[in-house]
């Protein structure tokens, strides 16, 4: 595996070390309860964003796209193997990669998109589906019980939490507890959009780069809700359009 994360330079890691800051060489210990980790230590030059960014699994979407284009199972196999390896190396709530609900939500949605692209591959078997389903249930439980709501305004972290609850809530809509998470996420998503997005569609902080991020975090769940047959309020639609 060769990749670059947040200016680390080209790194080779096989198997992938999900706990390492490749820029400084610092590694967060395995098997520690997520609330006991020190994310920022001013005594060294470690950057927790490096392992966390890698564990968001954005790169799995590229592998999924490669499979769709080529139908080559080497790409679907890599998606499956990386997810299985991540689950093994990051038991629920016991790694640095469970320390922030925003990252948990982003990872879950990326997994869902990547898996959707490779579902017709013979590599995706029942054993794997059961394993990833269990992990995604852990993800939605974690998000709901670690919400990052701010006051008087929330921001990208809370929006990510709510987006994750919408995506995972629709996936597991037949599970009563998850339906509760979804209902909460839906009402809060609408409230946050009305609070944070001006009627003109501009985010209240009026920062171009931040506006771009918030558009993604609000628009994707709204469009998913529409696709799932929900009647999205007109003012919500126009704020994210």
What residue spans do the PLM features occupy?
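Extended, charge-enriched "interface" segments that sit outside catalytic cores
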Residues: 1-42, 49-53
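Aromatic-lined, polymer-binding surfaces characteristic
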Residues: 30-31, 37-41, 47-241
